[in-house]
């Protein structure tokens, strides 16, 4: 009898230890990882992730919804709306992105750690805290310019492990394109309201760097004030090396073909616009996507 009781007690102890171990595993902090990932479909549009340490884009920024708080991000982290993070459809994860609100001149660095935005007409999705510092209201959309901070992004990538699962060849999904565009300063740029110069404004700065600086979970909340440079909204459908192909597409979607680049080596882009509001731009983008131009996007110029 005594032996049976001892065995029973030992079994209960082992079960308790196993349960504690399971709780420890479930409660363990997620480990961020470096990833590029496979082509995927979101919001009815295919996206093709790739490494790009020189990406510069313009477009409209969205603010992450409250319902995403606490969920697992694409690179293994748990979403925290209080951190300076963002989602991007194609960039390597993580990456450091310099985001400028063109409507008020405020600039802030964020860490890209997720895919998105779900809306195909948005170029980046900002955490609540990042959006607040940039003066972007939840539920709204703001004209932004985004640029990868190359050195910081490479250092971040070097300090993280690669994902365990192999990557699929991009040919497994329909062929798409990722556009890149540099935004030249607007000749009609005006100072942001209430701003007299372009000196850095530090609203709040995190503590001194730690040994984990190569994989920061919290970027400093350093906001820089510059000049407001709001532009005009366009839907950019595609880019071609031949004028006749661009004109053919433009005729099919009600746009126009524009030459750009150095003389003698011009390329031709198809655009619709300028569009007078975000709502009008969204409708034009929706029509263009329905016409089968899957790489179309909203840009600011």
Question: What do these predicted ranges mean?
Answer:
Residues 24-26:
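Bacterial signal peptide processing site
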Residues 214-230, 239-301:
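Extracytoplasmic
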Residues 9-13:
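N-terminal export leaders
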Residues 160-232:
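Long, low-complexity, acidic/serine-threonine-proline-glutamine-glycine-rich intrinsically disordered tracts
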């Amino acid at each position: 009898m005594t032996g049976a009781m001892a065995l029973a007690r030992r079994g209960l102890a082992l079960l308790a230890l196993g349960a504690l171990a399971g709780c420890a595993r479930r409660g363990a902090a997620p480990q961020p990882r470096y990833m590029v990932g496979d082509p995927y479909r979101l919001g009815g549009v295919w996206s093709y992730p790739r490494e790009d340490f020189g990406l510069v884009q313009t477009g409209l920024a969205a603010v992450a919804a409250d319902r995403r708080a606490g969920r697992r991000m694409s690179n293994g982290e748990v979403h925290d709306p209080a951190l300076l993070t963002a989602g991007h459809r194609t960039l390597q994860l993580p990456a450091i992105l310099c985001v400028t609100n063109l409507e008020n001149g405020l600039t802030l660095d964020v860490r890209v750690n997720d895919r998105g935005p779900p809306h195909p007409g948005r170029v980046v999705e900002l955490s609540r805290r990042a959006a607040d510092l940039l003066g972007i209201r939840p539920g709204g959309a703001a004209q932004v310019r985004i640029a990868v901070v190359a050195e910081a992004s490479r250092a971040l990538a070097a300090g993280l492990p690669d994902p365990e699962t192999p990557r699929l060849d991009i040919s497994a999904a329909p062929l798409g394109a990722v556009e890149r565009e540099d935004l030249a300063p607007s000749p009609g740029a005006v100072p942001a309201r209430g701003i007299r110069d372009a000196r850095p404004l530090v609203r709040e700065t995190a503590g001194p760097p730690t040994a984990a600086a190569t994989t920061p979970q919290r970027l400093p909340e350093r906001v820089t004030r510059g000049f407001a440079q709001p532009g005009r909204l366009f839907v950019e459908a595609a880019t071609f090396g031949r004028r006749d192909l661009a004109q053919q597409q433009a005729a099919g979607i009600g746009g126009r073909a524009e030459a750009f680049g150095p003389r003698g080596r011009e390329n031709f882009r198809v655009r619709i616009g300028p569009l007078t509001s975000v709502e009008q731009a969204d409708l034009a983008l929706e029509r263009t996507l329905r016409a089968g131009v899957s790489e179309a996007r909203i840009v600011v110029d």
